């Protein structure tokens, strides 16, 4: 844990169909400790904070990595620590691969995408752009939460719907959906001090596969019992503590 005078900049990278609201409970705890925090709304998320953001036309690993690099340079950030959740973990990994000198030696992967999505699901995912947001939010939330989140389902669902309320456009949403199921962290190569934090009941990533990815990058891995993929909603206090102890 760092002291108050040496706090590094933290750059949070949200997941697909998310925006900065999804990580806000965790982010606020770090703000309260005095950390410099950046948490942009990354396309296809609508820019709810009216920030000056880079333009994203290339919804690929290189495109997203370059978007993050441009954001870092445009805001004069001094090698921020990347903290990526879900699809954000792929973006963080892509950035570490392509622009390692722009970011800190430490990198955090929350609910890391540790394995490729089955091919039959890949063909279905882009179709969600044509379904009502409330319906998709309900189905996705119901599927992704673990045991511990079930008693807070309504609260979690409200945040999920808030995050998915508005996108840049349908074309971007489809492109991002395709990106989200084409990559896994293991597709990239980088030499960073990695921290993996995942729910033990994550339905998108088997614990055994997440362990393999952590081993590849010689990273520290922590599983949160009874939590699913949405650890940022289910156990924000514990997630904050796990990140904070390794900063």
Ranges and model annotations:
Residues 118, 135-189:
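Conserved alpha/beta-hydrolase catalytic His-Asp/Glu region
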Residues 84-92:
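Gly/Ala-rich beta-loop-alpha elbow adjacent to hydrolase catalytic centers
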Residues 39-81:
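Active-site loop/oxyanion-hole signature of alpha/beta-hydrolase fold enzymes
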Residues 97, 105-134:
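Flexible "cap/lid" loop of the alpha/beta hydrolase fold
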Residues 203-209:
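Conserved alpha/beta-hydrolase "acid-adjacent" motif
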Residues 190, 196-198:
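Short beta-strand/loop motif that positions the catalytic acidic residue
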Residues 227-240:
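Catalytic histidine-centered segment of alpha/beta-hydrolase-like enzymes
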Residues 5-50:
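Conserved HGGG/HGGXW glycine-rich cap/lid loop of the alpha/beta-hydrolase fold
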